[in-house]
Amino acid sequence: MSFASEFKAFALKGNVVDLAVGVIIGAAFGKIVDSIVNDLVMPVVGAIFGGLDFKDYFVALKEIPPGVPHALDAVKKAGVPVFAYGSFLTIVLNFLILAFIIFLMVKQFNRMKRAEPAPAPAAPPEQVVLLREIRDALRR
């Protein structure tokens, strides 16, 4: 079997194609969740915590030079090291929302699966049948 035909057989297997489709859909879905978090959820959370953009929450690890606005991008451009916990919290929230949505999708998928009927119990071996007959005969 040639290298090309081996690769073709591998690439056209159902599992590989399904995985590729899942990765592509997952990447697109990740962008949707990013938009939900950044454009809908975080502005509300930021408003609750004082009207600032939540991703601009940080702690400067050195003194901010005079004249530099107190915004994450400006402070970083000024070369001040920062502990950007707001960005981290945004990413954690993004992950939690994505994980919750995937959980709901998997739960629905499992619900939609048809329950397979339980297989009929296998007939007991002949020895067991004979032993049961002997037992029943002795009980009489």
UniProtKB/Swiss-Prot annotation:
The record gives the membrane topology as: Multi-pass membrane protein
The answer to whether keyword Cell cycle applies is no
Work out whether the entry's keyword set contains Ion transport.
yes
- Keyword field: Cell inner membrane, Cell membrane, Ion channel, Ion transport, Membrane, Transmembrane, Transmembrane helix, Transport
The compartments listed are: Cell inner membrane
Report the GO terms under cellular component: plasma membrane
Signal peptide range in chain numbering: none
PROSITE patterns, A to Z: MSCL
The UniProt family comment states:
Belongs to the MscL family.
Alphabetized PANTHER family for the sequence? LARGE-CONDUCTANCE MECHANOSENSITIVE CHANNEL, MECHANOSENSITIVE CHANNEL MSCL
Name this polypeptide is given:
Large-conductance mechanosensitive channel
Q: Which organism is it from?
A: Anaeromyxobacter sp. (strain K)
Gene name of the encoded protein: mscL
